[in-house]
Amino acid sequence: MIGLVGKKVGMTRIFTEDGVSIPVTVIEIEDNRVTQVKELDNDGYRAIQVTTGSKKASRVNKPEAGHFAKAGVEAGRILREFRLSEGEEYAVGQSISVEIFADVKKVDVTGTSKGKGFAGTVKRWNFRTQDASHGNSLSHRVPGSIGQNQTPGKVFKGKKMAGQLGNERVTVQSLDVVRVDAERNLLLVKGAVPGSTGGNLIVKPAVKA
């Protein structure tokens, strides 16, 4: 089953009939418009490309304008592709609404996490701090050794060090679908999702459901 592109609206809470409070993230999923259908014969795999939302004409470059015009679809703010399962069929120009999640129990949500700038190893990787005293006067939050000796004589790739924190693609898996509001194009999922308010999200049925 395909996924859809949505936008993070924010967080709130709803109550069950028993009075239990559930923290939910509200995701606005406007109709996704199919801009391209990829077929096994031409492309080597089956997929659809979708767009959603709208974009000022002045913000659409010429290649994008031609692509949207060929599909006969209004220019959207983002283009994303989803693989098709066996038996799934879609046509260019078709609209797909949030209702496809009506029978889905859990979803995976992908977004871009909030950027936190340059961060040290304590904040970025949860390194422990060194002694506050006992002879330590300068190295309370430093990472310590980053290597070994003449052998191997280098710092290994992937070494946890200070650097950019956040602003990367993150997927949160198996979030419960609490409510699907087709009238207002809203999907309510239990818990938090990556990114700030207004950020683009990709919502797919959970892989591990």
From Swiss-Prot:
One of its GO terms (biological process) is translation. Methylated by PrmB. Keywords: Methylation, Ribonucleoprotein, Ribosomal protein, RNA-binding, rRNA-binding. The keyword Transferase does not apply. InterPro entries: Ribosomal_uL3, Ribosomal_uL3_bac/org-type, Ribosomal_uL3_CS, Transl_B-barrel_sf. One of its GO terms (cellular component) is cytosolic large ribosomal subunit. Disulfide bonds: none annotated. SUPFAM superfamilies: Translation proteins. The modification N5-methylglutamine is found at residue 150. Residues 132-153 are annotated as: Disordered. GO terms for molecular function: rRNA binding; structural constituent of ribosome. Part of the 50S ribosomal subunit. Forms a cluster with proteins L14 and L19. Belongs to the universal ribosomal protein uL3 family. One of the primary rRNA binding proteins, it binds directly near the 3'-end of the 23S rRNA, where it nucleates assembly of the 50S subunit. PANTHER family: 50S RIBOSOMAL PROTEIN L3, LARGE RIBOSOMAL SUBUNIT PROTEIN UL3C. NCBIfam families: L3_bact. This is Large ribosomal subunit protein uL3. It comes from Photorhabdus laumondii subsp. laumondii (strain DSM 15139 / CIP 105565 / TT01) (Photorhabdus luminescens subsp. laumondii). The lineage of its organism: Bacteria, Pseudomonadati, Pseudomonadota, Gammaproteobacteria, Enterobacterales. The gene is rplC.
